[in-house]
C-alpha cells in the first residue's frame, strides 16, 4: 500500500508548526509519527498484520517500536462518523519509535508496506 500523508510535527507542514514547536516542543518532536495508508481500514489492518518486529499494542510508553491502527482497535467502538470527528481516519496508523536500530525499524516498515 502507499502512504498518502505523514503526520509529524517536525515536518513543518504549515507555518504555525514552527511557532508551536518553538513554544511547546523546545527539545524536539518526540518518537510519535502517524501516517495514512491509501486503501483505508483494510490497508491499515493488513499493514499491522504484516509487521514482524514492530509490536502491535495500544500503549505508547515502551522502549520497543509500537504500532496501532486506531480504527480497528482503540476507536473501533465508534461509528465511522465519530471516528472522523476524533481525527481517526480509516487508513491511519500511529507509530511510536523505539530503541531498535533504525535500519531494523525501516526494514520492517518497508516489508509490511510492500505486502499491504
Regions found by a protein language model. Name each.
Residues 49, 65-116:
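PLP-dependent enzyme catalytic core of the Aspartate aminotransferase-like
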Residues 1-63, 78-84:
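Conserved small-domain helix->loop->beta segment predominantly found in fold-type I
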Amino acid at each position: 500500500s502507499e502512504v498518502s500523508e505523514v503526520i509529524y510535527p517536525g515536518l513543518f507542514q504549515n507555518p504555525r508548526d514552527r511557532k508551536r514547536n518553538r513554544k511547546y516542543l523546545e527539545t524536539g518532536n518526540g518518537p510519535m509519527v502517524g501516517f495514512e495508508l491509501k486503501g483505508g481500514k483494510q490497508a491499515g489492518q493488513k499493514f499491522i498484520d504484516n509487521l514482524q518486529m514492530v509490536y502491535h499494542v495500544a500503549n505508547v510508553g515502551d522502549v520497543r517500536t509500537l504500532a496501532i491502527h486506531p480504527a480497528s482497535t482503540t476507536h473501533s467502538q465508534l461509528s465511522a462518523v465519530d471516528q472522523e470527528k476524533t481525527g481517526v481516519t480509516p487508513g491511519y496508523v500511529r507509530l511510536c519509535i523505539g530503541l531498535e536500530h533504525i535500519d531494523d525499524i525501516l526494514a520492517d516498515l518497508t516489508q509490511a508496506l510492500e505486502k499491504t
